């Protein structure tokens, strides 16, 4: 099968199911059942197709389709795998969550059709970001993710959710406009120096000629790009949309926003980071990333300590973790880059679990207020264990996966003489740990309210959490070889732009859990 057919199936599947879900609005009597079946089929096909494309790209190194317009390499493969897995799990969770909302009159069957329609449309726009090799299409796809997900944020039609949706649209549209300025600067400069100016629209072609780009223009372009796509990533001080959107959206949408959408913007930023490092060196980009990253971690850490809304707390944790990824990229080097990519994966798993858990809390307690949400171990013990495990993982406790990427970060920072940054980072991560542990202790063990019915929710709202917790434990103790292969391929691409590739073999694979280093070493020898 040709790559063009493969990409067409991948991109058109969520778009087709989006249209079918919207069409179910006309089947008023059987809309709920029909749209649920369509949704289930759509997310299953998406998972299969995404993993198929990732496997194909890993075997081939990189693949192109539609000329040079569509492209998946090792870096894109990592983000596509995350999108496919998280899209599937949040899709499964959505079935149980939305069934409860419809049964209790929070949503009508017609609105449920709208929800699933926009859910698949949102997946399509994020797929377009990940697979696009065209700089302008990449930017347009980022903008499209805002529009498609804004409807999901405001799906309940309440004043607070509509305000959050409009705030999200306005801030991200203004922010991403800066990204367009940076994109135009890169394109215009590339078109003036490349033998074929029309090829300057393609990222892979610009990368080949990036050493010819004007350093002054690229320095300015990176400032615009960091502000623009950093807004969508949730970096401070452009993060103001994120807490409101995450807290007001339905919980499965909150999980998608945090675990996939932020990654999409980060992927675009990393792709430009590679080009800019080739053009002007890594010192200036790394310095900016360290500044924005540390500010994001610092501000988020203090907000995590004082939050009393469980979903807003998790939203600020997303700001903190995106800041930490920026710090890891800013530290640089083979270990720092690998830690950043590993942390992106780890954060996606942990945050999806916790937003699903917070959704179960909201369904059971009817509130997100941490002064009311207490005694989960007595109210719904199975969910409580899963939620507690997710909270410990997000806090960076062993043997969970985030401990490994944070340990790599500390080691990379010390190895590259960033002692002050590492000391400050450790202090801030201690504050985050305190905030998350305090939240978990209160939610799990405080005296439960008498009016709340006891008993866990259905398997549709707990099975995704089980899968995620198992994956996090596996990633913290013995990372599967296919995952190592994807991470190694992604880190190789980023390192090729920072000129640190020759040192790769002797650094990051030594920090992996026992039994997983061998495959990474084989990959680095290719």
Swiss-Prot record:
<dbReference type="GO" id="GO:0005886">
    <property type="term" value="C:plasma membrane"/>
</dbReference>
<dbReference type="InterPro" id="IPR001516">
    <property type="entry name" value="Proton_antipo_N"/>
</dbReference>
<dbReference type="GO" id="GO:0019645">
    <property type="term" value="P:anaerobic electron transport chain"/>
</dbReference>
<dbReference type="GO" id="GO:0006007">
    <property type="term" value="P:glucose catabolic process"/>
</dbReference>
<feature type="transmembrane region" description="Helical">
    <location>
        <begin position="256"/>
        <end position="276"/>
    </location>
</feature>
<protein>
    <recommendedName>
        <fullName>Hydrogenase-4 component F</fullName>
        <ecNumber>1.-.-.-</ecNumber>
    </recommendedName>
</protein>
<keyword id="KW-1003">Cell membrane</keyword>
<feature type="transmembrane region" description="Helical">
    <location>
        <begin position="322"/>
        <end position="342"/>
    </location>
</feature>
<feature type="transmembrane region" description="Helical">
    <location>
        <begin position="457"/>
        <end position="477"/>
    </location>
</feature>
<keyword id="KW-0812">Transmembrane</keyword>
<dbReference type="InterPro" id="IPR001750">
    <property type="entry name" value="ND/Mrp_TM"/>
</dbReference>
<dbReference type="GO" id="GO:0016491">
    <property type="term" value="F:oxidoreductase activity"/>
</dbReference>
<feature type="transmembrane region" description="Helical">
    <location>
        <begin position="34"/>
        <end position="54"/>
    </location>
</feature>
<dbReference type="GO" id="GO:0009326">
    <property type="term" value="C:formate dehydrogenase complex"/>
</dbReference>
<dbReference type="Pfam" id="PF00662">
    <property type="entry name" value="Proton_antipo_N"/>
</dbReference>
<feature type="transmembrane region" description="Helical">
    <location>
        <begin position="75"/>
        <end position="95"/>
    </location>
</feature>
<feature type="transmembrane region" description="Helical">
    <location>
        <begin position="217"/>
        <end position="237"/>
    </location>
</feature>
<comment type="function">
    <text>Possible component of hydrogenase 4.</text>
</comment>
<feature type="transmembrane region" description="Helical">
    <location>
        <begin position="122"/>
        <end position="142"/>
    </location>
</feature>
<dbReference type="GO" id="GO:0006974">
    <property type="term" value="P:DNA damage response"/>
</dbReference>
<dbReference type="InterPro" id="IPR052175">
    <property type="entry name" value="ComplexI-like_HydComp"/>
</dbReference>
<dbReference type="GO" id="GO:0016020">
    <property type="term" value="C:membrane"/>
</dbReference>
<feature type="transmembrane region" description="Helical">
    <location>
        <begin position="4"/>
        <end position="24"/>
    </location>
</feature>
<feature type="transmembrane region" description="Helical">
    <location>
        <begin position="168"/>
        <end position="188"/>
    </location>
</feature>
<dbReference type="Pfam" id="PF00361">
    <property type="entry name" value="Proton_antipo_M"/>
</dbReference>
<feature type="transmembrane region" description="Helical">
    <location>
        <begin position="286"/>
        <end position="306"/>
    </location>
</feature>
<comment type="similarity">
    <text>Belongs to the complex I subunit 5 family.</text>
</comment>
<keyword id="KW-1133">Transmembrane helix</keyword>
<feature type="transmembrane region" description="Helical">
    <location>
        <begin position="384"/>
        <end position="404"/>
    </location>
</feature>
<dbReference type="GO" id="GO:0009061">
    <property type="term" value="P:anaerobic respiration"/>
</dbReference>
<keyword id="KW-0560">Oxidoreductase</keyword>
<feature type="transmembrane region" description="Helical">
    <location>
        <begin position="417"/>
        <end position="437"/>
    </location>
</feature>
<keyword id="KW-0997">Cell inner membrane</keyword>
<keyword id="KW-0472">Membrane</keyword>
<dbReference type="GO" id="GO:0015944">
    <property type="term" value="P:formate oxidation"/>
</dbReference>
């Amino acid at each position: 099968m040709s790559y063009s057919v493969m990409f067409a199936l991948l991109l058109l599947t969520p778009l087709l199911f989006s249209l079918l879900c919207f069409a179910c609005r006309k089947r008023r009597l059987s809309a709920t059942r029909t749209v649920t079946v369509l949704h289930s089929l759509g997310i299953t096909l998406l998972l299969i197709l995404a993993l198929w494309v990732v496997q194909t790209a890993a075997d081939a190194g990189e693949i192109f389709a539609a000329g040079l317009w569509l492209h998946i390499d090792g870096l894109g493969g990592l983000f596509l795998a995350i999108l496919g897995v998280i899209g599937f799990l949040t899709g499964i969770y959505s079935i149980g969550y939305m069934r409860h909302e419809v049964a209790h009159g929070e949503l009508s069957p017609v609105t449920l059709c709208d929800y699933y329609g926009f859910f698949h449309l949102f997946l399509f726009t994020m797929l377009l970001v990940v697979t696009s090799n065209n700089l302008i299409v990449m930017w347009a796809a980022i903008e499209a993710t805002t529009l498609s997900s804004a409807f999901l944020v405001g799906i309940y039609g309440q004043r607070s959710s509509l305000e959050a949706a409009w705030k999200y649209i306005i801030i991200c549209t203004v922010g991403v406009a800066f990204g367009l300025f940076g994109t135009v600067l890169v394109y215009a400069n590339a078109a003036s120096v490349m033998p074929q100016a029309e090829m300057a629209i393609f990222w892979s072609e610009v990368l080949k000629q990036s050493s010819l780009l004007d350093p002054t223009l690229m320095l300015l372009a990176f400032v615009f790009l960091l502000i623009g796509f950093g807004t969508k990533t949730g970096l401070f001080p452009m993060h103001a949309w994120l807490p409101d959107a995450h807290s007001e959206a339905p919980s499965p949408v909150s999980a998608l926003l945090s675990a996939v959408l932020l990654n999409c913007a980060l992927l675009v930023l990393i792709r430009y980071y590679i080009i800019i490092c080739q053009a002007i060196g890594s010192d200036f980009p790394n310095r900016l990333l360290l500044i924005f990253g540390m500010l994001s971690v610092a501000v988020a850490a203090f907000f995590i300590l004082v939050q009393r809304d469980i979903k807003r707390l998790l939203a600020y944790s997303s700001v903190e973790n995106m800041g930490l990824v920026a710090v890891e990229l800013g530290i640089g080097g083979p270990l720092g880059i690998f830690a950043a990519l590993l942390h992106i994966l780890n954060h996606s798993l942990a945050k999806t679990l916790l937003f699903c858990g917070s959704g179960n809390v909201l369904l059971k307690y009817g509130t997100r207020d941490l002064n009311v949400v207490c005694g989960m171990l007595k109210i719904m013990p199975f969910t409580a264990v899963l939620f507690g495990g997710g909270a410990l993982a997000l806090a960076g406790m062993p043997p969970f996966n985030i401990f490994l990427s944070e340990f790599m970060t500390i080691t990379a920072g010390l190895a590259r003489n960033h002692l002050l940054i590492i000391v400050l980072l450790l202090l801030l991560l201690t504050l985050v740990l305190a905030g998350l542990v305090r939240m978990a202790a209160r939610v799990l063990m405080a005296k439960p309210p008498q009016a709340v019915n006891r008993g866990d929710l259905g398997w549709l709202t707990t099975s995704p959490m089980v899968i995620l917790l198992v994956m996090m434990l596996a990633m913290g103790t013995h990372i599967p070889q296919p995952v190592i292969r994807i991470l190694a391929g992604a880190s190789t691409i980023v390192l090729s732009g920072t000129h640190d590739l020759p040192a790769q073999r002797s650094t990051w694979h030594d920090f992996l859990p026992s039994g997983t280093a061998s495959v990474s070493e084989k990959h680095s020898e290719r």
